[in-house]
Structures are given as structure tokens and as C-alpha cells.
């Protein structure tokens, strides 16, 4: 992902989430700047088909939704998958699988202990197929969960070395 992709990312995001879950350009840019090697886009001839944003974090501590800034914690031991979204026309084409594979490759390169995410829009069972299990957020992360909505579920899985 590059800064030039953010306008298309925002368009895709608006197709996938209700207004309570939309993030600003500033929020996306903050995460991209914090971890450019773990933010990905899937390109097709017509433009962006989807994106995945992930940032190093502390396991159990998801960042708030639409945070205006992001700094990688010194004690980061997880790669937090913050957002995966596809253009509606790209669903069922393998784009999601390709983006998730890129995420798992980034996990290996960063040598973290956990993969984490917050499941929204009834996606818990989707993420369970990739080995994620419900977990309890801790510290400031517990308070951040309310920014994702009532149905949001924090999930985590250990990374095999």
C-alpha cells in the first residue's frame, strides 16, 4: 500500500462498513506510516480490488478504531490485522485469500508471537477458519473495543515459529 492508494481504500471502505465503522484518511495514513511492510492492496486492471492494514501491537491491546495517530509499541509481540475489505465486485475471486496470505507472510518476517484482530460485521466464523479464536483484550485495548461496535469480537492466535 502507498499513500496514493488511500483515496481508493476509502472508497472500498465506504462500500463495506456503516458510517460508525468508517476511518479517516489520517487514520489510514498513520497506520501505513507506522508499518508500511504490513499494509497491502490487491490491484486489478480497473484499480484496487481490496486492502489489508496490519500494524505491530501488543497482544490483547487492539488500537482504537479511527485513531488519528499510531505508534508501534516498544513491546509489540503481535501483528494486529486492523482491517480487511474488498470491493464488492472482488468478492469470491480469491482477493481476500491473497491479502490474508500476504498478512501471514508479514507475520513470519516480523517474528512476532501472536496474530490478532477484531472481528466485525459477523466475521468471527470467517476468521476462525484461519485459526483465530476469541480472546479477552487487556489494558487500554479493552477500552478500545467499544469503538468497534457492540458485536465486535477480539480474536488472537499464536504464531508457529
Describe every region a protein language model picked out:
Residues 100, 105-120:
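Conserved GNAT acetyl-CoA-binding A-motif
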Residues 86, 92-105:
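Conserved acetyl-CoA-binding loop-helix of GNAT-fold acetyltransferases
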Residues 37, 149-156:
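Short hydrophobic/aromatic beta-strand or adjacent loop that forms the aromatic wall/cage
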